[in-house]
Amino acid sequence: MAIEFRSVTKRFADGTIAVDDFSLVLPTHKTTVFVGSSGCGKTTLLRMINRLIEPTSGEITIDDEPIQDRDPVQLRRGIGYVLQNAGLLPHFTVLDNVATVPVLSGVSKKQARARALELLDIVGLDRALADRYPRQLSGGQQQRVGVARGLAADPDILLMDEPFGAVDPIVRKELQTETIRLQRDLDKTVVFVTHDIDEAFLLGDQVVILEKGARIAQVGSPSEIMENPATDFVAEFVGVDRGSRALSLKKTPHGTVLVDAAGRTQGVLTGNGPEAGL
């Protein structure tokens, strides 16, 4: 399902313009990553897709249908949503957390729980965790449950709002690799928000670098942005001048590899997006 922003502006009650005349098409069955520093408007963009935030002006469409014409509750039930810190219901078991949205959508509890068990397998969690509560899980396990819940209604669109920002670097790498695998297997339209350009390049087919007010500094594939940063701001943001953390592209027989200055592989780019993990 293609998502399109058409001249969208969001002005909050205090006068802050979070999004200023934003227009962009987010291609279907691809991962689009909004990346930028805190306060640039990336999360506001994401939350307007499922109408948690309403635009002040402009229009957002899904497959050319304005989302403002749809019931917001029904819209949200058809869009997966994964948050930082998972946002799990503390008094529900893992199984019931995952099964919640399908049950609310009219699926029988038995069917929803059966599907929830399948999703635990898909996101790499042992079924033995199904009867545990969120407080009994590690941070990484909670995030995997959050991803499973986001996929529970088999949505065409999955929104991911800095989902790995609160876990340690090792777990974060594992979750990033798992996200690449899931997208390859499930073929969803994914919108991912992060402040980390390395994460954006690892996960994104289309990367959107944002400045304040959600103004687009550059949009393109990771390789396009790395090879041809549009402005000095983009060049600095993507790490061209970051010493040991600088990123570069390396051609190999297996494709184009994203490496840091120490030669460590950060991802594999094939075509316009990530096809393999770390």
Regions found by a protein language model. Name each.
Residues 103, 110-128:
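Conserved ABC ATPase "signature" region
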